[in-house]
């Protein structure tokens, strides 16, 4: 999802981050649940948000983060280093994401 969840579920996340003059923006990779963008977060990638950038520049930077992080998370899922138990993300001892916490920016 193209935001640092739980911030900005739904659509138009890049514009919302820019309109609110957020200091950071990014992506969240999460399990899908019935709640809109409310599933447990597996990993997040963040960038400093330059408010002088155009929307297209922000989207391009977000795509670069996505293209880096998605395959790494998929590999961990396929290698069963990440799983879901009782609606909580579980990491194996050798997962690169095991010590990561959801990012929080004000």
Regions of interest found by a model, annotated:
Residues 86-106:
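Short, basic/aromatic-enriched C-terminal tail that caps enzymatic domains
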């Amino acid at each position: 999802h193209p935001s640092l969840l739980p911030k900005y579920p739904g659509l138009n996340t890049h514009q919302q981050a820019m309109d609110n003059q957020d200091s950071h923006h990014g992506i969240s990779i999460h399990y899908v649940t019935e709640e809109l963008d409310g599933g447990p977060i597996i990993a997040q990638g963040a960038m400093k948000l330059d408010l002088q950038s155009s929307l297209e520049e922000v989207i391009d930077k977000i795509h670069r983060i996505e293209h880096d992080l998605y395959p790494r998370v998929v590999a961990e899922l396929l290698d069963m280093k990440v799983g879901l138990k009782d609606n909580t993300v579980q990491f194996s001892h050798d997962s690169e994401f095991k010590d990561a916490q959801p990012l929080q920016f004000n």
